[in-house]
């Protein structure tokens, strides 16, 4: 029998809390995302506007005893404020006076749909933000290569790998016993959690993209040289990528470019870019070997660098996966102002906050209950993620 809550005990806040819980449970990709903006920074921000978050460089290291202080260099990462909403007529909202009915008819279906809509957008916005890729079959080797690529750039966080359920199933058929269970991660990700492998928690998410590569995709990029200071004022010590054209979701190798690790050290890892749905790539800042300049994320051998990009995969169909620092993705929420004359409630579960507004429409003599999930998402540091192209 349903658990009845009499009188006004089943409040709007409790209803919103139930929905927020459903949303949180159905967003595995976003569950452990990090907040990069404080509520103070978000105060007064408006839907649709683009703002910046700022990250700093690892600084310089010098030989000897003499201290040589350097300036902290920041670089800006743009982030756009978005919103998803769903609404129901007030009668439907109010008529369900017990937890079980409200959960079955309102909280679960609407919470899940809202969650998956937000999750899809977060994935689409952040998956292309990576400077390393791994191409392979749905097997344990590809999972290992993705995880170890993060180790090569000194990524020190907790690693998680997201793949489509069909990819996870194919891999598991090759030896489910290879996955090591983790009670903590199982509680967080629930049924989406497959297990630990190669130092990463493997999570299923059916919204991970599938892309078709024709094999004829081309790309080009342009660079502007950066000169040094003082005695090196006439020397090219780095480059900024000033233009890029390429096909969305196709990975391109930047020839002659290697990744600079998160510790500021030059690595031997090849440098890739993936264009997003708008054809844009993350900011690429290059240093000439041996120079600490420009808060660089990649390096080239000499100051006579000629830019070129080549398609990094053959033609075919690929399911995309991602191995990343668990908190590499940024997920922030901002607040709407209350509508005049409306009743409002806001509740949070995990890193998800939901706002409910009930208001009347005098023109049509109706009353609606509206649920909003305002958010901003990004992956500000592409070196903290690796994208897997699983051939299917």
Language-model segments: residues:
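N-terminal "assembly arms/tails" that initiate or stabilize quaternary assembly
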Residues: 1-76, 385, 389
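Short, Lys/Arg-rich flexible segments
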Residues: 2-37, 89-101, 110, 115-134, ...
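Surface-exposed molecular-recognition determinants
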Residues: 7-15, 162-167, 354, 358-359, ...
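Short, low-complexity, charged/polar segments at coil/turn and helix-coil boundaries
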Residues: 36-46, 139-169
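Long, contiguous amphipathic alpha-helices that act as assembly "spine/axial" helices in icosahedral shell
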Residues: 53, 77-138, 151-165, 254, ...
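Short helix/loop capping segments that flank catalytic or ligand/cofactor-binding pockets
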Residues: 61-64, 170-173, 378-380
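Internal mixed-charge
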Residues: 108, 261, 275-385
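Autoprocessing Asn-cyclization modules and mimics
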Residues: 169-295, 392
